Amino acid sequence: MSKEKFYITTAIAYTSKKPHIGNTYEIVLTDAIARFNRFIGKDVFFLTGTDEHGQKIQEIAENEGITPKQHVDKIAGQIKDIADMLNISYDKFIRTTDDYHVKAVQQIFKKLYDQGDIYKSEYEGWYCTPCESFWTETQLVDGKCPDCGREVKKAKEEAYFFKMSKYQDKLMEYIESHPEFIQPES
C-alpha cells in the first residue's frame, strides 16, 4: 500500500539582499509541518530554494561591479548555509539559475505558448523598483508605494501572460471537490 503523498514548499527566497529573519521564520515553520507529516506516515516532499532573477538583482550587481550570477551565488549560498545550519529537512533546494531548472522552464513555457495558453501583451501601471511591484492608481497611498512608502514611476512593459480563464472552470471544480488541495485555508 503506498503512502499518502504530501508536497510542501516555501516561497523561494529572493536573492537581492542578504538573508533576514523572515527567511528563517518561514523555513522553520515549513520544516515543522514537513516533519509532522513524515511522523504521521506521509510520503513528504519538501522544496525550498532561491529566486535569482529580477531587475533589483541586476541593479545591485551593477552597483557592486559584479555580474548578477556572482551576486546571487553569494546570497543563495548564505541562504542554503542557514537552512543547513538549522538542520532543515528539505528534500530539494532549488535555484532558479540551475541549468536543469532553466531548461525545464523553457520546455514548459514553449509547450504552453505553442498550445495558446501564453500570450504577449503590455502591462502599464505605477512601478516601485525597490519592491519590484506594479500598482494601480487606487492602490497608491498619497501617490506612493503602499508597501514601502517610496516614490513610484509610471511604467509600461511588454510581458507574457497566462490564459487562466481557459482553465478557470476546471480549476474551481477541482478546488471545490478537494478542499485540502490548498492549505492553509484562507
Model-derived features: positions:
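N-terminal, positively charged nucleic-acid-binding surface of large information/translation enzymes
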Residues: 1-186
